[in-house]
């Protein structure tokens, strides 16, 4: 294959696409670079479908190599291991906009591997990974309705910024990634510092407009490569069988979708499916039961969508903008630092907040270096929450993605380290699920943090919106059920406060989602969000003044920087002895600030007292209680402060003559001594006899 290269300017960066040199045995491979950040994207697609395949087996793996940043991996094995959270999230980010662009009925296995081979810390890898994937698919010859463009949008000083650099993101009020085709937005992922609906929508439209540079460049690149298209045609629809199934099952399917209880509705649909399949297979033994089931699913979708578009009540009887019943409670787990139970219809989350010390922060070692994360949010989705059995183990991609979305929704209201020096971990346990458990996690997290006494800037609520569209007719749905998510055209999640949006995630399954539709969805989402916040505020409207009795308290004191070594001690011995004696955790900063974490004031007082003793200076003329540490011929050494000793000379033990030190003192003995002198070498001279009464002088004339 002849090497082909395409370069173009994209905002402040130069993008280069190259193929025909590397990974030539893959179906398609592209080396994509944005300045000096480069990724190798390979696409392999099987020409044949596995017999009985009934879903599209697309896999996306984004992987980072530490050599890309000139680093060697840590750990014993010194090689990359399981995917990091960022790698998992980026894999999902690439998957989401490309999956809906493969045609219905395409069931061939496709694997996309994106490998970061050169990384400039100022240029995030996700956008160039999406661009490279789009280019590789465009030249693969596979049926793909692309190409896809992608853009990162920042918002600083009232202006949108295209493809913000890492350092620019630190001052940006917005970090938004948008992907789409020439005519449609397909995916949005964002985190914002409480921005209005208009600003957020403007960012999406700005990103879509700018990404047309990518779409056009990839189109030209694919035309130059000119890969032959696969000889693939979707199987024609079995109209006869579809009509037969409709006649047999449409009425009962409509009745089933008037059952509001999720599990009862599920049972009714399963029974109807079994009954219909049996009837058709009995009439025609050669008929494939799997094909009947697939067409029944299409009927299911048609029934739900047609009812909504006709203005009839939704599955559970609600109108399009109505929110399910809410139930909110806080402080439900007595030994946790903060907890909440958030229930919205048949979706429920138990959320627990835990406060920790600096050493509890999560150390993230990425290509851009090591950073400590002081706020963690973990989302668990056990199989019982949907009435199923299943494997329980490490978190799956979906759980990691939902946890990160919930964290994005809360991040903007978290206090700074100076305002609240605790490390915070939140865990959301989904105990029931029927739509938008990630947004239930946002609501529950806001409640649990306030219950824990975390001074968040405002309450945050989240809501999931859906869409059913047919030609020009569309209906936006608030607080979607699982079935509405599955059978609808859009999943649109919005989190925010009463003042604005903190996170926006959007996945669109069809083209033709206009700016008007997104405006309607954002307006309806705001109304829903304000309603939920009103209910939440009735349970708890601000952070508690008192933290849980089981949460650590922080006590702070300041010492001279040259005393830090004294508090730490040789090999850390002193700091260990203080923490063990006081049952506290102690952290020392370079400027001499000491933070003591204790569950009780008395324990903190013990630690403070010991630190003050260690850092205190010995004063001449002052009396100390000390411990005899060594006996020598010429006197005894006494520890008067932790790590500070002085010498009691044999002549300073008693007023009378002392012939042997051991006759008066023993090692370990506690005695009172007076500091007589501190010489230029900081040697301390002590006296016992200065604290003793002098014996009375003998009377005159006595013999």
Curated annotation (Swiss-Prot):
Swiss-Prot/TrEMBL cofactor(s): Mg(2+)
One GO CC annotation: cytosol
InterPro entries xref list: ExoRNase_PH_dom1 (IPR001247), ExoRNase_PH_dom2 (IPR015847), ExoRNase_PH_dom2_sf (IPR036345), KH_dom (IPR004087), KH_dom_type_1 (IPR004088), KH_dom_type_1_sf (IPR036612), NA-bd_OB-fold (IPR012340), PNPase (IPR012162)
Catalytic reactions on record: RNA(n+1) + phosphate = RNA(n) + a ribonucleoside 5'-diphosphate
CDD domains with a match to the protein in the record: KH-I_PNPase, RNase_PH_PNPase_1, RNase_PH_PNPase_2, S1_PNPase
GO biological process assignments: mRNA catabolic process; RNA processing
Any one GO molecular-function label of the UniProt entry: RNA binding
Keyword Nuclease: no
Recorded superkingdom: Bacteria
Annotated keywords: Cytoplasm, Magnesium, Metal-binding, Nucleotidyltransferase, RNA-binding, Transferase
Binding site for Mg(2+): 485, 491
Domain S1 motif residue range list: 621-689
Pfam family, one: S1
Enzyme class: transferase
Domain KH: 552-611
EC number: 2.7.7.8
Subcellular location: Cytoplasm
Task of the protein: Involved in mRNA degradation. Catalyzes the phosphorolysis of single-stranded polyribonucleotides processively in the 3'- to 5'-direction.
Family label: Belongs to the polyribonucleotide nucleotidyltransferase family.
NCBIfam families: polynuc_phos, PRK11824.1
Subunit record text: Component of the RNA degradosome, which is a multiprotein complex involved in RNA processing and mRNA degradation.
Protein name stated in the entry: Polyribonucleotide nucleotidyltransferase
Organism: Pseudoalteromonas atlantica (strain T6c / ATCC BAA-1087)
